[in-house]
Amino acid sequence: QEDAKNSQNDIINFIKSSSNYKNLFPFWGTNCIYVEIYKGLIPELSKLKNVKKIDLEMGLIQEIESNSSKKNNIFFDENGVEPGIEAINVRPLWEMGYTGRGRLVFNYDTGVSSNHPAFSERFFANFYPMSQCWDGYFSPSPNGLNDHGTHTLGTMCGLVEETNDTIGIAFEAYWIANDFVTSTVEELPPVVDMITSFEWAFNPDGDLNTDFD
């Protein structure tokens, strides 16, 4: 955070010296600045020492088909492993002990059915406040309105212990999530909120002195 702050000082001071801007948001997670600024200032801004790139927010993302009206059928295969997992040859890593144990993953997607048996017991909110485990933009608590996020979280860390059906890569990892991905571009949260969600995931409890999260 300190490195980002130091490298952004001159840029922020330049922006603030002009009255032709609004909505200035500095970020440390990716060391960037979001600002709505008069286009005539962009050439001057680009000449500043610490400016590597200036990009225009286009708001483009691949649309995801909504599955909210479809029945979410769950099938378990005893001692099974998903073909995609076999395809990336992850077994040698598992045999070395790399199973996600003691790790925390972040699912940035459409939301999650937190009671899904493949990962419900490893939801971080079982142990810590919901504010540190769920960053909801559309819903204050985990939801499964669109099953895309539930599917991708399963790919990340799913495991049905009763049948030993291994769905995910890091099948012993704990997880946190958000619901920022939508089915249409028009429904997307502002880019500022999307970047902020990643910064939240870097430090969910807001305390730089803790590392469990």
Regions found by a protein language model. Give the residues of each.
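Short, surface-exposed ligand-recognition loops at beta-strand->loop->(often short) alpha-helix junctions
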Residues: E2-N6
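Short phosphate-engaging motifs
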Residues: S7, L41, N115
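Autoinhibitory propeptides
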Residues: D10-E95
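Sec-exported extracytoplasmic/periplasmic mature domains
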Residues: K16, N20, S46-N50, E95-Y98, ...
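Charged, often glycine-rich, active-site loop that binds/positions anionic groups
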Residues: Y38-K39, V191, T196
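Subtilisin-like serine protease catalytic core
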Residues: V81, P92-D193, D207-D213
